[in-house]
Regions:
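Alpha-helix-loop-beta-strand connector modules within alpha/beta enzyme cores
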Residues: 1-4
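Glycan-recognition surfaces
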Residues: 6-111, 142
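Membrane-interfacial catalytic/cofactor-binding modules of polytopic membrane enzymes
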Residues: 72, 119, 123-160
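Carbohydrate-binding surface patches
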Residues: 93, 99-102, 107-109, 143-187
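Hydrophobic, well-ordered secondary-structure elements that form the walls
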Residues: 162, 200, 223
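Short acidic/proline- and small/hydrophobic-mixed sequence motifs that coincide with surface turns
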Residues: 170-174, 195-196, 208-209
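Solvent-exposed beta-hairpin/edge-strand motifs
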Residues: 180-206
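C-terminal beta-strand-rich structural cap/linker in extracellular carbohydrate-active enzymes
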Residues: 210-233
Length: 233
């Protein structure tokens, strides 16, 4: 590879990679699978939150732990069982949000000629895809059986993001304290002040919501998520 005379990305599929060998993958490869084959089953997607937390400190320029291909759109043609993804619309959005905020390589495991407009829109949301930028650094700051919370910061612009995920099987309210974001990346010294006012820019809907207080929260249906860019007033 070093003698080929041109840049090459080396992608490994040890499936799943062992975290204790992280140094080896970072030194000798660019991408490496952190999971077995990933398919459109909710239990596999829910488990990916644990895997991403395990590997989140090993994402950097030229080093990308790989969550595997995105099972969206029409699948299974190569296996003789062509079908539409089993993921619900909300689960698809949750998967895209996690892959992007974590910084996974983005590869689509679908029949491209059969992509519908909804799937295409999901795959081409520029604001969500911006999180893949090497200047964005993310951490999972909470994970339990019912919810997950990720925070990210763009080192170049200073923009801070929060992603809330409902991992439970019923509608639930997921919350994060501004103080948690402050401790992770730093917004400002007075983020814990109850008078703090912010605008939450929803990356998926494009809608803005003004809020005041110390807690950000959203009521989410089962397996749904929301991701905001937090704009200070």
């Amino acid at each position: 590879i070093q003698r080929c005379g041109r840049p090459i990305v080396l992608s490994l599929s040890p499936g799943p990679a062992l975290i204790e060998h992280a140094w080896h993958y970072e030194k000798y490869a660019n991408m490496w699978r952190i999971t077995d084959d990933f398919w459109d089953h909710w239990d596999l997607l829910k488990d990916m939150f644990h895997r991403c937390e395990l590997w989140q400190n090993h994402v950097s320029e030229g080093c990308w732990p790989d969550c595997d291909m995105l099972p969206l759109g029409t699948l299974g043609k190569g296996f003789g069982e062509e079908r539409t993804t089993r993921f619900t619309a909300e689960e698809q959005k949750t998967m895209m949000t996690l892959w992007c905020i974590f910084g996974s390589p983005m590869m689509l495991g679908a029949e491209l000629t059969l992509l519908d407009q909804e799937t295409l829109a999901l795959l081409t949301n520029r604001e969500v895809l911006h999180l893949l930028n090497s200047d964005c650094h993310a951490r999972q700051i909470r994970l339990d059986d019912d919810c997950a919370v990720w925070a990210a910061r763009d080192a170049k612009t200073g923009d801070v993001y929060a992603a809330l995920f409902n991992l439970s099987d019923e509608t639930a309210t997921v919350s994060v304290q501004l103080e948690e974001l402050t401790e992770t990346f730093g917004l400002s010294e007075n983020d814990g002040d109850s008078t703090v006012s912010v605008t939450l820019h929803d990356l998926w809907s494009g809608c803005d919501t003004n809020t005041t207080g110390t807690t950000l929260s959203s009521e989410l249906i089962t397996h749904a998520c929301v991701i905001w860019k937090i704009l200070r007033h």
